[in-house]
């Protein structure tokens, strides 16, 4: 089930670009500032929403069936015995949620990165991806599926020579070490990269063969 709210009847490519840039700069001003005030920040499988079309220009309300949510819960059926194992479960759960939600929101064909599918319907930039991944993580946390990690504010990295980039973040409960959960580099439904946040902040990018469209096994956890 879905209900779509679009920021404007016809959002031009220029407006999308300006919106995405502006959203990135806004994230540097305060903790986890979302780009719209109608984003559900306490999501539930029965009611949450998904950003798409760059900079959350479009927002679609989604409801999972009991069967769909049970599929997600089953990823955690065997409790993780250590944080690394749970990070693998998180990767699988995020990929599954993207696969289930894609047909409801028109985002099944989302391509990794911003530019390969820029301007096409249902495409996502890092603002969309980081908000959506945070939404999924919050639902997992809300239903007690995360034993070793908690969900924290998103993070943005800045560079003089490239665009700002934003990711979802989890924190290991025992060590307080934070991990980036970054699905932006990958096509819809692929398991996201999970890596130490400090490594991600240093400008980390995946090897070309692991990035979207490059073949290989995408989304490996970086130790």
Regions found by a protein language model. Give the residues of each.
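Bacterial N-terminal signal peptides that target proteins for export
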Residues: 2-18
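Short N-terminal segments immediately surrounding and downstream of signal-peptide cleavage
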Residues: 33-54
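Acidic/histidine-rich, surface-exposed loop or edge segments in extracytoplasmic proteins
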Residues: 52-59, 64-82, 110-119
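Mid-length scaffold segments of soluble, non-membrane domains
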Residues: 89-149
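Hydrophobic/aromatic-rich core segments of domains that either
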Residues: 138-200
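Low-complexity, Gly/Ser/Thr/Pro-rich intrinsically disordered linker/tail segments
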Residues: 202-223
